[in-house]
Amino acid sequence: MVHTLHALPTTGDRLLVLALCAQWCGTCREFQPALENLARARPDMVFAWADVEDDAELVGDLDIDDFPVLLVARAGTLLHYGVSLPLEAVAGRLIDALATADAPRAAVAPAAAAALAAQLSGPRS
C-alpha cells in the first residue's frame, strides 16, 4: 500500500520509501503504478507518495527540479535522497540495496531532506 503523507503510519524501524512527485508531471503519473507494485512486494516497508505542491506544508523547504525524487529513510535517518529513473526495476534494486545494507550510508542531501526524514519517522497528529 502506498500512503499519503497525511495518512502515513508511524514507521519506527521500518524502511520508509517516499516518492516526491507532482500531479502535473507525466513521468510521476507513469511511476505511480510501479511504486504500488514495489509496495505490494515489500509489505515490511512503508511506502508513501507526496505531491510537492499539494503537500508543500509537509515537504517544507525542499527545492525539487526533477521528478520523481525518492527519499529513503529508516528510524528517522536519511539513507537516500535523489532523482530516480521512473522504472520499477531500477527503484526496486535501490530500495533492496538500502534495506539490506549492513550500516546506514550517509546521504548527500539538502538539510531539509534529512529534517523531513526525521519528522516522518515519528507519530503524527
Specify the residue positions occupied by each region the protein language model found.
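N-terminal leader/targeting and pre-domain segments
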Residues: M1-L15, G92-S125
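Non-catalytic, surface beta->alpha helical segment in thiol-disulfide oxidoreductase systems
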Residues: D66, L71-A112
